[in-house]
Amino acid sequence: MPKMTDAQKRDIILEMLHQRDAIKTDEQAVRKMIDERLEFVPNKKLYKFRRCSIKNFKTLEENCIWMPPANTFYDTFDCTINIDLQRNKRDIEVWLREKYPRLSYDLARGYCESHGVEMRQTFEDMVEYLQTCIDSNGDVIEEKEAAFLNRFVTAEERELLEQSLDSLIEIRAKFMEYEDAMIQVVHEAIEQMRTRMRDAMLVYCMAEHHDIGSLWENYADVYKGFCIEYSFSDYAEKPFEDYKNLVYLLPITYRARLPYFDMVPFFEGVIRQGIAQDTSWQRDPGLNADLNMQLYYKKKEYAFEREWRFGINNKGNCKQYFPFVSALYAGKDMKPGNLRRLCSIARKLRVPVYKQVPNRDNNGFDYEIIREENV
């Protein structure tokens, strides 16, 4: 079974972003994407481990799942953005040095246009002006400025040019003065986005296998709970509303060191929005893909989970119909009353129940089907 690479995952996310509206209603497009996704799911089955509780039994009996908000996860770094402010500060300084003049020019031109002033100079003219007419303290070298102006305009036109140049100098000085403060503003914006992402997402996590001891111990009450098997082999035979959320299903990538989110595009976008009210960066597919990729990384110590997950917007709709249950597995130490309840639910759902028992060599588990007469 091939593993989905990060490059493949990013391409999938980009496709979903490009087809954001289509995947809400286009059944053919959604089925195509789900089919491609399931090629990476072993046997097209995934598993969920649960404790025995009234809520969990009721949700299962109704053929539903409970999708908790990401902000309830024990791992505070899950479903969030991993940044390195100090490392990105160097990258941002490079950006300021290499791309700042273009941003300054664009902002100055926008400022002039909004004030009815024609900006006749090209970007190259502005670069030359900044390099030759402004000293290291940001002050104008008047004699060089005069020489520069005389090359472009008549005396009558000079006042208009000075207005455009003054606006450029004003913006440039402001940026230079508050450079560190802007980096902090971006950092705070990312922190707000981290919180918003965890608050705004409902997430359902599943595993590739049912025989994972750590999951039985951590999520199934140390073998006293149960495991739900979901099969997606015949998902397309069900109504579109029942399977449409599977389009968001993706695997987790486990890393010893979590990849950092590159703040530079975010930094530029926040600055453009703050100064020029340009919000186009928020719709940039590449930036949004990189943000979404951050939701599918976890530390390597969680690799035993072999997790897949999908998320939807948090609209208070934690309970979702999910009619894909194909089998149930009872933990070896499940109490008799809970076992009877699980078997009753299995009859209603028309799926088999297996009981976890030590194997003959006593070094693992077998899963034996439970007959009704034995319950």
Tell where the protein language model's regions lie, with residue ranges.
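Partner-binding and oligomerization surfaces adjacent to conserved cores of proteins
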Residues: P2-V375
